[in-house]
């Protein structure tokens, strides 16, 4: 349903679905461990230079994603910025009052953290230090959006030819 809204009403697409992302070293409010394994998928698209990320969690593991849904929020969840030194940026943000809510690593050694300053849960700030492979994938998805003909709202990454 959300993809249909973005593609038909807002002319954003195509979306690329990454199913059941594999993360490691996930923490949630400072708690590490196996109990924090989150099963979720994302659908990615671009509108100009802005990446749209639709997240669907498939489990009941506590996370900022289902915490948001449980609070029945219907607004922007988070904004993301990329960094080359995530540890330093986290320290700076925490010194300014931000709380590190959730984070972890991707299988290609990218690192991400979600931070909030006022317990409002909207919008949360995500900072991510990504691998070259992830940045390249995002570039390919962005390029696919430029000449999108609206015929296929959902595409497979293998369909991208640049």
Predicted regions and their residues:
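A short linear hydrophobic-aromatic micro-motif
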Residues: 100-102
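Short Pro/Gly-enriched beta-strand edge/turn motifs at strand-loop
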Residues: 23-30, 96-98
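Short acidic/glycine-enriched loop/turn segments that link adjacent beta-strands
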Residues: 107-111
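Glyoxalase I/VOC metalloenzyme domain signal
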Residues: 1-16, 32-41, 46-97, 116-162
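Short recognition patches in nucleic-acid-associated and regulatory proteins
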Residues: 18-21
